[in-house]
Amino acid sequence: MKKTTEGAFYTREYRNLFKEFGYSEAEIQERVKDTWEQLFGDNPETKIYYEVGDDLGYLLDTGNLDVRTEGMSYGMMMAVQMDRKDIFDRIWNWTMKNMYMTEGVHAGYFAWSCQPDGTKNSWGPAPDGEEYFALALFFASHRWGDGDEQPFNYSEQARKLLHTCVHNGEGGPGHPMWNRDNKLIKFIPEVEFSDPSYHLPHFYELFSLWANEEDRVFWKEAAEASREYLKIACHPETGLAPEYAYYDGTPNDEKGYGHFFSDSYRVAANIGLDAEWFGGSEWSAEEINKIQAFFADKEPEDYRRYKIDGEPFEEKSLHPVGLIATNAMGSLASVDGPYAKANVDLFWNTPVRTGNRRYYDNCLYLFAMLALSGNFKIWFPEGQEEEH
């Protein structure tokens, strides 16, 4: 895939799209700080982070009243980007204490849903959590250094987790989270289909540098496989991706998840961050232009579930603020596109969500705020900061 822009991995420079589109540095930094405070502070209307005792904390899915590996891994990524080791360690400690599975077919993975008291709702994992845990742990190691005691030996924990993701089931029970032949991430380990929003090639590029040596080629190949997969999973005219898709990219609608809905929103954000970190391509710019064009004539209060060809359902979006955030974050891949600024402005003028469905929206909101302000960074090992 021919790159049309350089990425921050090579330049060590991060675009601040807010600034490029006319916002002042002071108001941008204030907004980032305020967004963090709304999610991790004391405002009961907007907060999603809760502390337990002296050394534990969790992010609550406020709509489902559970704690998910999605949110916990997101929280760790947010904390390392914001330089909050205290909160990172609380979340990781809660995760290891309550979610990590040491026996059974999924030993080495994390239970995807728990109650706030730590009781497991499920003994199965969801791979989008594991991939975010792994990179957040590497970044923590590189930013703060590894701790001497488990589970705060961050880089060792990350490598161990990625080893399990690739090799689970070799010579015993269990399943890998990636199909080892086509290098594509699965929706859950025991099935052979995918979720386009799980594909994070920009993460796998970094895993190919920092994972166990024997798996580095696998991760490099996974990055390329995911970039190619997104081309066939996103609709050629609308740019919309389904929540579940088969390995050939076609929607998997066996259980009603073959349409553009909540999970799908993350695809635009992921493409944007991949372009920011590793450089954009003609395809990534066009893909974001298509998504932004599709929503250009739609009001957020009328966002719906859509077939990927754009046909709307009656059902309204559950997370319109999240969709505004991800479409804006996509602008990192299409900075000069006809809708890039309008999407960033719409996001800037949209407040953090309140109410019981706020968790997912506000996670996507903070990621977009970080990315669009140049604050969603790759944290390199000491000594590699200047290497190209």
UniProtKB/Swiss-Prot annotation:
Changing E70A: Activity is 0.01% of wild type. It holds the Pfam family Glyco_hydro_8. The active site is at E70, D263. Gene3D superfamilies: 1.50.10.10. GO terms for biological process: xylan catabolic process. Optimum temperature is 50 degrees Celsius. Stable up to 40 degrees Celsius. Optimum pH is 6.2-7.3. Stable between pH 5.0 and 9.8 for 30 minutes at 30 degrees Celsius. Keywords: Carbohydrate metabolism, Glycosidase, Hydrolase, Polysaccharide degradation, Xylan degradation. InterPro entries: 6-hairpin_glycosidase_sf (IPR008928), 6hp_glycosidase-like_sf (IPR012341), Glyco_hydro_8 (IPR002037). GO terms for molecular function: oligosaccharide reducing-end xylanase activity. It catalyses: Hydrolysis of (1->4)-beta-D-xylose residues from the reducing end of oligosaccharides. Belongs to the glycosyl hydrolase 8 (cellulase D) family. Hydrolyzes xylooligosaccharides with a degree of polymerization of greater than or equal to 3, releasing xylose from the reducing end. Only hydrolyzes the beta anomers of xylooligosaccharides, with inversion of anomeric configuration. Hydrolyzes the glucose and xylose-based trisaccharides where xylose is located at the -1 subsite, GXX, XXG and GXG. Does not hydrolyze xylan, chitosan, lichenan, curdlan or carboxymethylcellulose. This is Reducing end xylose-releasing exo-oligoxylanase. It comes from Halalkalibacterium halodurans (strain ATCC BAA-125 / DSM 18197 / FERM 7344 / JCM 9153 / C-125) (Bacillus halodurans).
